[in-house]
Every structure is written in C-alpha cells, then in structure tokens.
Amino acid sequence: MVLSAADKTNVKAAWSKVGGHAGEYGAEALERMFLGFPTTKTYFPHFDLSHGSAQVKAHGKKVGDALTLAVGHLDDLPGALSNLSDLHAHKLRVDPVNFKLLSHCLLSTLAVHLPNDFTPAVHASLDKFLSSVSTVLTSKYR
C-alpha cells in the first residue's frame, strides 16, 4: 500500500505526539491483543502475560521501537524492517493474521491516548501505515 504525502505527514505528526510513550503504548496494544484475541498468546508461552508484566512491557518496547524506526523510514519500509521480517518469517513463524490483529489494537490504543489528534484522516493514514508495516513483515513468508 502506497502512502501519500498527506499520509506520511499525518503519520509523522501523530507519531511525534506518541513521543516517549511508544513502548508503553506498544505494551498496552499487546495486552489488548492478548485479551481480545486469546489465540495470539500461543506465540508467547514463556511470557508472564499478566497486566503490567515486565516481559509484555519489554516486548511492547520492541514493538514501539520498530514502529518508530518505520516512521523514520516511510520511503523505505522494506529496507528498514528487513531484519524483523526475516525474524518473524523464518525463526518465529508468526501467523500473518496476527499483525492485523496487533495493528487493530494499536489503533485502539492510539485513539484512547490521542483523542484530539485521532481525526478520521489521521486514523486512515495510521491504518495504511500499519497495513504497510504488516505487509513488509509478512513479505518473506513466500
């Protein structure tokens, strides 16, 4: 999915509001995913999945850091996320549908924390961005 200039502007502006909360929001989105889509827990059998768990927070930080990296490389998502794509496709073998589920939970989390900035246009741009990230992360499954 191609991000327009307006989408890129919206994504960068929204992510600038996330600021230093990327890891916190990533962890919250993971918790939402585990609660709303319990089958996703199967990829984390070694994690303490309880609310506020250090392991969920640590993985949330990884998610947040990866998205921050992606926002900084909107014109080259495949290059920026190549290592993560390899990891998820070849080592972790995460079912691609789970990226869509996490994206949904990330959008919900951002809507809660950025209510004044989460306009329909920003929502659409973030959805396209997360869809693009998901596409890149699943590109090496083939």
From Swiss-Prot:
Residues binding O2, per UniProt: H59
Residues bound to heme b: H88
Keywords tagged on the record: Acetylation, Heme, Iron, Metal-binding, Oxygen transport, Phosphoprotein, Transport
Modification N6-succinyllysine occurs at: K8, K12, K17, K41
Entry GO MF terms: heme binding; iron ion binding; oxygen binding; oxygen carrier activity
A single BP term in Gene Ontology: hydrogen peroxide catabolic process
Family designation: Belongs to the globin family.
Annotated protein name in UniProt: Hemoglobin subunit alpha
Organism field: Equus caballus
Phylogenetic placement of the source organism: Eukaryota, Metazoa, Chordata, Craniata, Vertebrata
